[in-house]
Amino acid sequence: MDGSSLWMLFLLFFIVFPQMKQQLIQWRRVTAIRNCEKRRGTRIITLIHRQETMGFLGMFSRNFINIEDSEEVLRAIRLTSDDTPIDLIIHTPGGLLLAAEQIARALKRHPSKVTVVVPHYAMSGGTLIALAADEILMDRHAVLGPVDPQIGKYPAASILKAVESKAVNDVDDETLILADVSGKALRQTRDLVYELISERLGEEKGMELAKILTEGRWTHDYPITVDEAADLGLPVVPNDQDS
């Protein structure tokens, strides 16, 4: 066998092997999910975004909530009978608000109990989805996060604060436009959060929590712990032992 053939075999191995390994991992995950569904009597749906290494080159991809995710999750919800509870296992840094909003509203409308399971973190749009649940089952060290909207690379609340600290004549047109968009984004997100939680918390408490989570009180990556989430009024259950 000549050198070029050996090189082709070497290249083929390092292309095919990672794919086979990933398929094996996926098969094990599906098996574990099906066993868990039988034990809990629920339909388990997963929304998992991890930084995955790809092949022997060590390249990686970072995943976020997108429209493809919402299509898949909504399809799974539609295929779940009304009398079957849903467990949504979520692990995500967040992502596209539209996609997260679609998932949250679909979960909210499901007639049976909805539990969102957070093994590690569900930030931003992930937290928005969790707000639609009847119960949020979190690992003791898992975290949620604020859902304040981001405009480009800046928090909407910070854009408004910067503009309000200056005279209008001292602010360029582009920044004024960003401030207008920021105001709309803040109102829309606050109203969405209120829609998701007001039935459970009541109007006054629901609006208070909606403001807290959207007003830019914290940085966007601020970790809301299990205890803090419970203090805010979220239906959090710490997973201190196997259930």
List the predicted regions and their residue ranges:
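Terminal-region recognition feature
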Residues: M1-V118, L131-S243
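Long, distal/terminal scaffolding or interaction modules
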Residues: R109, M123-S124
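Residues that form or flank phosphate/diphosphate-binding pockets in enzymes
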Residues: L98, S124-G125
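Short glycine-biased active-site loop of nucleotidyltransferases that positions the nucleotide triphosphate
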Residues: L128
